[in-house]
Amino acid sequence: MAEKRNIFLVGPMGAGKSTIGRQLAQQLGMEFFDSDSVIEERAGAEISWIFDIEGENGFRKREERIINELTQKQGIVLSTGGGVVLSKENRNHLSARGIVVYLQTTVAKQFERTQRDKKRPLLQGVEDARQVLENLAVIRNPLYEEVADITLPTDEQSAKVMANQIIDLIDNFHG
């Protein structure tokens, strides 16, 4: 890869964005950011607390500011939150400022990966988490597809294998 272009990872919760993003950044010698972690750092609070106090709208406003800021950096790998694509502004920034990789996963795999995770505000206190994930997929999957330059399924691969696949695809990407 001659010049280091930004790589932005999008996809649903449990797709492996953070794990794959760290691996990718390490292999490419690029700086890694996780937008949810940056939001928590700046707020001095966990995302679940932000959701409780400010609601999803308050969180999404914070997310827009952070996405705008981080996507202006050069040569980074950015793992985004699952709902990042709900904002047209975020989709525009991601599309214009880097290569967007959509990490696809099935609802079954998402459920398996997130069922014991207490840091998923949209899944807290719900009767049927699988149904919530299915509902989110109906709304968000078309938006991930809209913004993606590259789409990869993540269900059966390790983070290292996924990172290598992304590197190969980006080396051949001329968008």
UniProtKB/Swiss-Prot annotation:
Pathway: Metabolic intermediate biosynthesis; chorismate biosynthesis; chorismate from D-erythrose 4-phosphate and phosphoenolpyruvate: step 5/7
Pfam families reported in the protein's UniProt record: SKI
Keywords carried by this UniProt record: Amino-acid biosynthesis, Aromatic amino acid biosynthesis, ATP-binding, Cytoplasm, Kinase, Magnesium, Metal-binding, Nucleotide-binding, Transferase
GO BP term, example: chorismate biosynthetic process
Class of enzymatic activity (EC top level): transferase
Required cofactor(s): Mg(2+)
Catalysed reactions listed for this entry: shikimate + ATP = 3-phosphoshikimate + ADP + H(+)
Subcellular localization(s) per the UniProt record: Cytoplasm
InterPro entries, alphabetized: P-loop_NTPase, Shikimate/glucono_kinase, Shikimate_kinase/TSH1, Shikimate_kinase_CS
Binding sites annotated in the UniProt record for substrate: D36, R60, G82, R140
Signal peptide feature range: none
GO CC aspect terms: cytosol
Quaternary assembly: Monomer.
Biological role: Catalyzes the specific phosphorylation of the 3-hydroxyl group of shikimic acid using ATP as a cosubstrate.
The protein, known as: Shikimate kinase
Organism, as annotated: Actinobacillus succinogenes (strain ATCC 55618 / DSM 22257 / CCUG 43843 / 130Z)
Gene name as annotated: aroK
